[in-house]
Swiss-Prot record:
An annotated GO cellular component: chloroplast membrane
Catalytic activity reported: chlorophyllide a + NADP(+) = protochlorophyllide a + NADPH + H(+)
Name of this chain's protein: Protochlorophyllide reductase C, chloroplastic
Subunit record text: Part of the FLU-containing chloroplast membrane complex composed of FLU, CRD1, PORB, PORC, CHLP and HEMA1.
Cysteine pairs bridged by disulfides in the record: none
Keywords: Chlorophyll biosynthesis, Chloroplast, Membrane, NADP, Oxidoreductase, Photosynthesis, Plastid, Transit peptide
Plastid keyword on record: yes
Gene: PORC
CDD domains named in the record: LPOR_like_SDR_c_like
Record-linked Pfam families: adh_short
KO phenotype (gene knockout): No visible phenotype at the levels of the whole plant or chloroplast ultrastructure; due to the redundancy with PORB. Porb and porc double mutants have a seedling-lethal pale-yellow xantha phenotype at the cotyledon stage, contain only small amounts of Chla, and possess chloroplasts with mostly unstacked thylakoid membranes.
């Protein structure tokens, strides 16, 4: 059979050598010179015809003179090298993934079996326990330390991530600080008010540093997602509940350039609830500016979203007890805007990976029937001139300019 296979590699015009062994129909027959029998000639002709028919039906092969190696043309449905590159799991970095929306999103992505999640969190042990508590498999996540209230921690996280030599396909800026009842401001390591320093400046530096990594991604859709908030969108009912978000002319934020950090972006008196709302406007303005500056050049999709009101989330843990008691039923039965953490996580996971939500520069929201749509940003959250100024001031504050 070995010689028969070798014959199949030769052009049909080459004749059989006059001396050798020929294996046909699993029976070895010896022939020498001119002593061919009529039976052997007939057997030879029949075998060659069979071999030619097999060659006609099988893929062509390229052979060397000795026919020592055989290279078959790959089947038409075999993955190309470009397709094979995207068969790996996607890698998504999610900030604040130890609880709430971040944890629910990490689980939703991990459950698909198509993603490895980097849980970028301030409390390593809390994140590890949280991942196990929701049943995430160890092979689907990695916990890495990140404290967005420290610009040095942000830089260290980026350095540590790059040491892993993992690709980066999606960055989700989710973590947030909310101190609505605070009477006095708290500050970050660099002296910024805690809400703007964590929610905006920490994420601003992180997104700028990791943009280079996103550019290199060969994943089908590389994305940067910033979680927004309806409370910072003043063209909605919730956005008009006092105190309303208002960045003014950014004089308070810009004062940090002179070492005179203000507790409020607009330079006004401190208000914990407004500080949070202002920071979310900054998030949405940053997303718009990232889209304008980098989408066309890099192919990265930049988007923000409001997944619905997660009224039971730990984000409200510093609100007064009466608020925490009444707010969930109010959202469930009056406004109908309530969503569970699990549902909100699935929505954010959609924005991470769903091809139908791959449009850049969009602020995504959901109807009560869970259908996604492109929401309208308020004038404050879509002001191109203010976004540019915020970008320039923020670059200087985090040391990028």
């Amino acid at each position: 059979m070995a010689l028969q296979a070798a014959y199949s590699l030769l052009p049909s015009t080459i004749s059989i050598q006059k001396e050798g062994k020929f294996n046909a129909s699993l029976k070895e027959t010896t022939f020498t010179g001119s002593s061919f029998s009529n039976h052997l000639r007939a057997e030879k002709i029949s075998t060659l015809l069979t071999i030619k028919e097999q060659r006609r039906q099988k893929p062509r092969f390229s052979t060397g003179i000795r026919a020592q190696t055989v290279t078959a043309t790959p089947p038409a449905n075999e993955a190309s090298p470009e397709q094979k590159k995207t068969e790996r799991k996607g890698t998504a970095v999610i900030t604040g993934a130890s609880s709430g929306l971040g944890l629910a999103t990490a689980k939703a992505l991990a459950d698909t079996g198509k993603w490895h999640v980097i849980m970028a969190c301030r409390n390593f042990l809390k994140a590890e326990k949280a991942a196990r508590s929701v049943g995430m498999s160890k092979e689907d996540y990695t916990v890495m330390h990140l404290d967005l209230a420290s610009l040095e921690s942000v830089k260290q996280f980026v350095e540590n991530f790059r040491r892993t030599e993992q690709p980066l396909d999606v960055l989700v800026c989710n973590a947030a600080v909310y101190q609505p009842t605070a009477k006095e401001p708290s500050f970050t390591a660099e002296g910024f008010e805690i809400s703007v320093g964590t929610n905006h400046l920490g994420h601003f530096l992180l997104s700028r540093l990791l943009l280079d990594d996103l550019k290199k991604s060969d994943y089908p859709s590389k994305r940067m997602i910033i979680v927004g908030s309806i409370t910072g969108n003043t063209n909605t009912l919730a956005g008009n509940v006092p105190p309303k978000a208002n960045l003014g002319d950014l004089r308070g934020l810009a004062s940090g350039l002179n070492g005179q950090n203000s507790s409020m972006i607009d330079g006004g008196e401190f208000d914990g609830a407004k500080a949070y709302k202002d920071s979310k406007v900054c998030n949405m303005l940053t997303m718009q500016e990232l889209h304008r500056r980098y989408h066309e050049e890099t192919g990265v999709t930049f988007a923000s979203l409001y997944p619905g009101c997660i009224a039971t989330t730990g984000l409200f843990r510093e609100h007064i007890p009466l608020f925490r008691l009444l707010f969930p039923p109010f959202q469930k039965y009056i406004t109908k805007g309530y969503v569970s953490e699990e549902e909100a996580g699935k929505r954010l996971a959609q924005v991470v990976s769903d091809p139908s939500l791959g449009k850049s520069g969009v602020y995504w929201s959901w109807n009560n029937n869970s259908s996604s749509f492109e929401n309208q940003l308020s004038k404050e959250a879509s002001d191109a001139e203010k976004a540019k100024k915020l970008w320039e001031v923020s670059e200087k504050l985090v040391g990028l300019a």
